[in-house]
Amino acid sequence: VSGLLYQKLGGPSVFPPQPKSMGEGIYGGGGWRTSSGTDRYRRSLYTYKKRSMPFALHDTFDGPSHETCVAKRETSNTPLQALTLLNDPFFNEAAQKLGQWAVEQKKEEAQTVKVLFKKCLSRPPDQQEQMALRGFYQKQFNRFKAGELGAEKIAGKGGGEVNQRAAWTALARVILNTDEFI
């Protein structure tokens, strides 16, 4: 949805960002060498796998164990998943990219909310959702503008007015954290 996924086929395993503690104390040594550039955004098929050092995101989001064939993945919705979506660098980068995209739309706020929502969830928001999202955007924008929150930290690098970009990033984080998106 954010446009970060790198579509290259084939190649060596990649190491997306994950907590440093995941590589500590494993049998056989070795750590997690976080990939850089576009390799950070490869499909999970290319993620390095080692039984003694699982990729945390796979475990958090019900990834199969790789020990047996699985015809249908289990699905769940847990607080740990919500916390991961709000705090993991991978998802924050995706939200920042969507926030930058929203700023570049140069449309009215209501229209941008509608387009961002549809881009993420493949359906337009109903009237109640539209009002709630616009209210959230306005509240966050005002908080960033007043200096209550660090706009630069939330928005990341990019063009356009930083408070606006940060507010769109915050809204993108909300949409990406919905059960419907997961």
For each predicted feature, which ranges?
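C-terminal structured "cap/appendage" subdomains that terminate the fold
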Residues: 103-172
